[in-house]
């Protein structure tokens, strides 16, 4: 009699990521995953007491996949641009994972403030202060505008509603960063002139 193959949590999570990349999160059920792995549902339920526990660990595992991808492209000397490009490129390269993480309620919903205050985003904002020689407040403003602009590009790439090559993605992001940095400078000049008029 052939020995039963044992599946660890790691095995199941790896196969889950492969399944989502191929078919999307909406198709993921215990039965469909078991069929994809080539086993019964027993190994899945042996590792997870219920589907919610499995989803919690899957969420972390998908974020790990995303973080590993982003890490390959980020340059701390040009943090805002490189992380924005990586975000949009991930949406193009791994649309099903991107959709799951950023276009459904699977990973939960956040306020703008909560988005700005994640560890990676705080790191990006602090790097912007050094690179662009702007205040922390201005760095947050620019980051917020660029972040959500880039998300717009990424969502269109994800659902294939726009065709952009690599060069076009880069140019769109670079131009938006420049526009927002000029906007900060203009706002500073405008406030200064307004103060003079009051005096």
Give each language-model segment a name:
Residues 136-159, 170-179, 196-199:
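Hydrophobic alpha-helical segments that form the core
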Residues 6-17, 26-27, 38, 45-71, ...:
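An amphipathic alpha-helix adjacent to DNA-recognition modules
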Residues 107-133, 140-144, 171-182:
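Amphipathic alpha-helical packing segments from all-alpha helical-bundle domains
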Residues 127-130, 163-199:
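C-terminal peripheral helix-coil segments that are non-catalytic and often amphipathic
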Residues 20, 53-62, 98-101, 110-117:
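Alpha-helical DNA-contacting segments of helix-turn-helix folds
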Residues 90-110, 127, 153-163:
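Amphipathic alpha-helical segments used for helix-helix packing
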Residues 70-96, 136, 146:
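Hydrophobic alpha-helical connector segments
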Residues 34:
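The alpha-helix within a helix-turn-helix
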């Amino acid at each position: 009699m052939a020995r039963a193959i044992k599946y660890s949590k790691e095995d199941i999570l790896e196969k889950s990521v492969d399944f989502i990349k191929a078919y999307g999160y909406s198709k993921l059920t215990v039965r469909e995953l078991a069929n994809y792995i080539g086993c019964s549902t027993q190994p899945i339920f042996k590792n997870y007491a219920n589907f919610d526990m499995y989803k919690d660990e899957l969420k972390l595992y998908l974020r790990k996949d995303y973080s590993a991808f982003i890490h390959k492209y980020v340059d701390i000397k040009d943090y805002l641009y490189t992380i924005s490009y990586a975000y949009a490129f991930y949406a193009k390269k791994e649309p099903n994972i991107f959709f799951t993480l950023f276009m459904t309620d699977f990973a939960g919903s956040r306020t703008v403030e909560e988005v700005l205050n994640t560890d990676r985003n705080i790191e990006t904002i602090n790097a912007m202060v050094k690179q662009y020689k702007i205040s922390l407040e201005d760095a947050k403003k620019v980051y917020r505008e660029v972040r959500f602009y880039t998300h717009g590009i990424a969502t269109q790439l994800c659902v294939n509603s726009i065709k952009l090559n690599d060069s076009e993605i880069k140019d769109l992001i670079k131009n938006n960063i420049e526009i927002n940095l000029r906007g900060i400078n203009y706002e500073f000049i405008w406030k200064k002139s307004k103060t003079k008029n009051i005096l």
